[in-house]
UniProtKB/Swiss-Prot annotation:
Compartments where located: Nucleus
Protein name per Swiss-Prot or TrEMBL: Pre-mRNA-splicing factor cwf15
GO molecular function, one term: RNA binding
UniProt entry keywords in alphabetical sequence: Coiled coil, mRNA processing, mRNA splicing, Nucleus, Spliceosome
GO biological process: mRNA cis splicing, via spliceosome; mRNA splicing, via spliceosome
Species assigned in the record: Schizosaccharomyces pombe (strain 972 / ATCC 24843)
Gene from which this protein is expressed: cwf15
Chain segments carrying region Disordered: 1-31, 62-197
Stretches with biased composition (Low complexity): 143-155
Amino acid sequence: MTTAHRPQFDPARGHSEMAPTRITSSRALPAHLKLKYRQESQGTEEEVRKQDLREALLRAEAAHFATQEHGASSEEVSQNSKLIEGFTSPSTDDKPNNDVEVDYQELLRQTLEADEDASDSDDSVDSSNKNSEVSIKRRKTESNSQESVDSSNSESSDEESDSEDETQQLLRELENIKQERKREQMLQEEKNRALEQEKREREIAFGNELLNKASSGSFQVKRRWDEDVVFRNTHKGVDDTPRPGFVNDMLRSEFHKKFLARFVD
């Protein structure tokens, strides 16, 4: 009997290897052993600190407004760019530059006014075109409505008389249909009530088996519960006499029994 299933008081523990030599693949070795730092022109902290984000934003805004201006001349765009280029941030220079003074509010106001003038001109052209189209459409609709009124006045009298006759006829037909449906519904309800009453009377008369002994006969079970099974009465017609067979015992064999019956009284 095995004892592998029994718990051990001293479980197996790993031991030091006697031959620690191993062959390690180069792919299993660590690839990067030193921490890498950002080099110049790779977005170091000093470079980010020296960037003038305000100047870049103003350049981008000026370029955008210059492209949006429809009637802006090249002189105005160049003047705006020169004003932006002349700006120097106080963080980069130790002394403020008094020679070049830029009014950024004035610059933004000029660009916004130019943009608004262009949009107003476009809106005025569009509104004038729309007004002309609306006036033409209004004239056409007025002429068509006048013609339709003249023709409808002549036909309205005939149509009113015909429509009144048709509505009266339709109302009469609708009333007849409602009456027929109501009669059919009443007949169906009476028929259903008669059937339910007949069914109820039959259940009352023949529903109780104890009161209907004559009709039901006796309460004896006519069929057995295992009458329709597959292997029922399989032992019928089978010979119960023992068949001669081989017995591994000379004293109980058929030959020994016959021998004793013949020679021994």
